[in-house]
Design a protein with these regions (language model features):
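Extracellular glycan-recognition regions
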Residues: 1-219
Length: 219
């Protein structure tokens, strides 16, 4: 019979551990924060999804913003350079970000995603000079634990015209009772409005870190 309680003794009883999931306003740091987290300007909860190209990304601590450049054409968000990610938490996870897409060009995308092989995303883009908010996803090809084989195309579920280049985007993920679903919302007319459908998430070996929330920009 398994024990209900197991006592362990820490080898570092005075150590302070920072959370794996937390908010960040990317604002100016004091010397103690810089000592703890390094010099680039992020808390330790953030991780790059790929090997970064640091000349294409800037943390403007004075303005409290993260500035990304779209200098590489990508097939979809999984190829985006400099995507930064955090873990998601059980049983539910809610994340918000404000995207300022004033400098976006036709064909660029900037926003937030639930990053895995069968990803879901909401992003600001521009088409023929018109600013749009879109919700896109990549659906499961098969029920194997192996990842998609690249035979499916990304689906754009909804696109809405937006007047302002500054848009609040919200991600809500539900992991309770193996629901494993995510939806995206945007702030308009003093309320949150859903864009696109709930998207089904899957754990597969192509992204063995599970599902992470990501901030991205790509062309």
């Amino acid at each position: 019979r398994a024990l209900c309680e197991v006592e362990t003794q820490s080898t570092r009883p005075d150590a302070q551990y920072h959370p794996l999931v937390e908010s960040d306003d990317f604002s100016e740091w004091n010397p103690e924060q810089k000592r703890l987290f390094g010099t680039f300007g992020w808390k330790s909860c953030w991780q790059f999804n790929h090997e970064p190209e640091l000349s294409w990304i800037e943390n403007d601590a004075e303005k409290g913003c993260l500035r990304m450049s779209c200098k590489k054409q990508c097939k979809n968000v999984t190829q985006a350079v400099n995507t930064i990610t955090q873990r998601m938490k059980f049983p539910m996870c809610i994340t918000e970000v404000t995207v300022d897409a004033e400098g976006i060009k036709d064909g660029d995308y900037a926003g937030m995603c639930a990053l895995q092989g069968c990803y879901g995303m909401a992003a600001v883009t521009k088409r023929d000079g018109q600013m749009l908010l879109v919700m896109r996803s990549l659906e499961e090809e098969h029920d194997s634990i192996e990842g998609n084989q690249g035979n499916s195309e990304e689906i754009e579920w909804e696109a809405v015209s937006v007047e302002s280049s500054r848009i609040r985007i919200r991600l809500e993920a539900d992991f309770q009772n193996q629901h494993d679903k995510v939806r995206f919302l945007y702030w308009s007319d003093e309320k949150w409005k859903q864009i696109g459908p709930w998207h089904q998430l899957y754990f597969k070996m192509d992204h063995f870190t599970g599902c992470r929330v990501g901030l991205f920009a790509y062309a």
